[in-house]
């Protein structure tokens, strides 16, 4: 099975590669940091499975790439991989055409189970994101708006830009 890994963090990308190398039947044909690159790889050749991070190199949107890849290669299975703890990501991944979603906080064994199930035609989407500790609070204690502000902060936006993005004065 031909596998492409799209992950901007080198250490995470290497870890994901090691999971596939430890199992028979998988061949990593591309391991790249950017979503735009993934679309180009799919234009040039077929891939059986893609692990696609939501936010990749240069803030490229992995979900946009999922949509574009599915238009080019509808039979390619795509598992969205994320550490974002927002229910909106689940819905956006489904709308983009992802076949499954896996949270980075989950175990290696769980990823390989999701891979096998996805390749067998199942769609694996958790009911809700995992609960994560953010400082002294749990992710489940934040409102959608608070999570949206946190996401903007993680993207490096200024307070002024966040206010503008959220329609505040």
Predicted regions located by residue number:
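Acidic, metal-coordinating helix/loop segments flanking the phosphotransfer/catalytic sites
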Residues: 31-49
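Short, flexible helix-to-coil linker/hinge segments that flank and couple to helix-turn-helix
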Residues: 89-94, 99-144, 148
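Two-component/phosphorelay signaling modules centered on CheY-like receiver
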Residues: 10-30
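Helix-turn-helix DNA-binding segment
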Residues: 135-169
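A short, hydrophobic beta-strand element within the central beta-sheet of small alpha/beta folds
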Residues: 75-85, 98
């Amino acid at each position: 099975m031909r596998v492409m890994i799209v992950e901007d963090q080198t250490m995470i990308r290497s870890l994901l590669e090691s999971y596939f190398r430890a199992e028979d039947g998988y061949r990593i044909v591309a391991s790249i940091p950017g979503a735009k690159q993934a679309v180009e790889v799919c234009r040039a050749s077929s891939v059986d499975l893609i692990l696609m991070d939501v936010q990749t190199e240069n803030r490229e949107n992995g979900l946009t790439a999922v949509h574009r890849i599915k238009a080019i290669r509808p039979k390619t299975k795509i598992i969205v991989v994320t550490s974002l703890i927002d229910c909106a990501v689940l819905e956006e991944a489904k709308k983009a055409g992802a076949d499954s979603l896996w949270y980075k906080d989950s175990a290696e064994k769980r990823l390989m189970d999701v891979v096998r199930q996805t390749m067998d035609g199942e769609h694996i989407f958790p009911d809700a994101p995992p609960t994560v500790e953010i400082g002294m609070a749990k992710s489940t204690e934040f409102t959608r708006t608070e999570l949206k502000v946190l996401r903007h902060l993680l993207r490096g936006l200024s307070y002024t830009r966040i206010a503008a993005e959220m329609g505040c004065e």
